[in-house]
């Protein structure tokens, strides 16, 4: 974490702190921990992301901000997931997804160079080279190649679904975007070994990312994968308050239908957007997973002190 901070301070980012206890669990698609504030008689949540507060700071005039802190998500535990973990989030005004990807790669190189370790890492019996430049590939292209079906933003769901059914591929999605995302998660993500930026995420799973001007339903979003795990998530931020309000209303409908991970409506954040968020590039970077790969530990529990345990009795 010291080297990550050094890099960001050296590139004129300002380190800030935002609330851990929040009236709405926003900024990510995740299930929160809930508590109650007795003095205010108000249900509150441990943060699932600092994103919406950091972007408020950008609206307020802080052009380059970052925070390193604990995130809490009331979800499953496995080799790469813990309910409490450490995240780096940064936001830069007048930047976009491409600038953020460049920054992530440069920041990781800074860590490798200062630790003086080989950029060829061994993890879970496999090798991956972190020497750059890292690949950047569209999710739609990966899915198209995997299944031998040309899929893009204007593909018809009926055409794609029938071809997948012919291949005996099971799926639950009802739109092209959700179908592409489901196929990527289930069949492709775990196969990515060398660090790779997967770009072009469907708008249905990217409520805060800017939609591409020339590809309806596709966003300027990336995730960085290595050794089959997500290391980072970033995008060109959605800055239109009307579009943001519409997307959050769609998420609220999903939540009312029983989707516990869907995002809540957040009128306060939409109101903040009305004051003007400049074009902004955002990043979320999983520090624990990065450390796992650096030191070759197969489980996230081995790089986090005092993980939660079930009582013996």
Where in the sequence are the language-model features?
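Histidine-anchored, small-residue-rich loop motif
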Residues: 1
